[in-house]
Each structure stands twice: as C-alpha cells, then as structure tokens.
C-alpha cells in the first residue's frame, strides 16, 4: 500500500519520461486525476484515461515528447513534490504568482479545488502547494 499517492504518481511520471516510455500507469484517486488533468491542460502530457481493471481503477497517462535531433526529449524537465505528509507547505495567493518566470506551473490544492498557480492567483486563493512542474 502506498502512503503518499501523489508522490508515487509524480515519481512514476518522472521515471517514465526519463526512460522515454510512451504510457505510464498511475493508481487512481480524485486528487491524482485533478493533477493529471492540469498537466494535460498546460501541455505537459498528451492525454490520460481512467481505466478499471477488476475492482481497481488506474489512470493511464500518455507522455509528451519533443523532437530534438535524433532523440526525443521529454516535455517535463522536472516534476517535484513540494508539500509532503510530514511537512505541509501552504502559500498565500501573493506567494504563488509566478514560477520559473512563467515557464513552470505550481499545482495548488485550494478551497476551490486543485488549481494551477495562475488560476489560483486570478481567483485570489492560496492553499497547499502539491507539486511544481516545468
């Protein structure tokens, strides 16, 4: 059993993109689905699909790559878990304005749901910083 499903999902995505895999399978939870949806909206992944195998649900994530000469380079340069079960990190709306000069995204769990940093700033809400990606 996984203690931190968000960290597990982020690690699976990071490892699959480093290895050049097209698809990776994540354990299902509503918060992981919300994170993956944001990654798709921001263009970090190609697509995702929730599948059921027996009595368990999974999320199949199709990773996105750029052509760099003869090699394919992952679109996700770095994806990192920020707030952890042992040490929660909360930021106010003014502290989550920009990340990596606008080239990266911070995913925040707010009272209005799981949101990217630009949308949370626009709505004027802060929250728990789940992860960063660029």
Curated annotation (Swiss-Prot):
Please list the GO terms describing molecular function.
rRNA binding; structural constituent of ribosome
Q: Does this UniProt record's set of keywords contain Repeat?
A: no
- So which domain of life are we looking at? Bacteria
One cellular component (GO) term of this entry: ribosome
SUPFAM superfamilies listed in its UniProt record: Ribosomal protein S8 (SSF56047)
Name of the protein: Small ribosomal subunit protein uS8
- Say what the protein does: One of the primary rRNA binding proteins, it binds directly to 16S rRNA central domain where it helps coordinate assembly of the platform of the 30S subunit.
Q: Which UniProt keywords apply?
A: Ribonucleoprotein, Ribosomal protein, RNA-binding, rRNA-binding
InterPro entries xrefs: Ribosomal_uS8, Ribosomal_uS8_CS, Ribosomal_uS8_sf
Q: Which family does the similarity line name?
A: Belongs to the universal ribosomal protein uS8 family.
């Amino acid at each position: 059993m996984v203690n931190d499903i968000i960290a597990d999902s982020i690690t699976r995505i990071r490892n699959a993109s480093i290895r050049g895999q097209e698809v990776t399978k994540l354990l299902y939870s509503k918060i992981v689905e919300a994170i993956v949806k944001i990654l798709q909206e921001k263009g970090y992944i190609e697509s995702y699909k929730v599948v059921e195998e027996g009595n368990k649900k999974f999320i199949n994530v199709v990773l996105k790559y750029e052509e760099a000469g003869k090699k394919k380079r992952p679109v996700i340069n770095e994806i990192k878990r920020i707030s952890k079960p042992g040490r929660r990190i909360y930021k106010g709306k003014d502290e989550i304005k920009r990340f990596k000069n606008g080239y990266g995204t911070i995913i925040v769990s707010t009272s209005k749901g799981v949101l990217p940093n630009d949308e949370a700033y626009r709505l004027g809400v802060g929250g728990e910083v789940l992860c960063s990606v660029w």
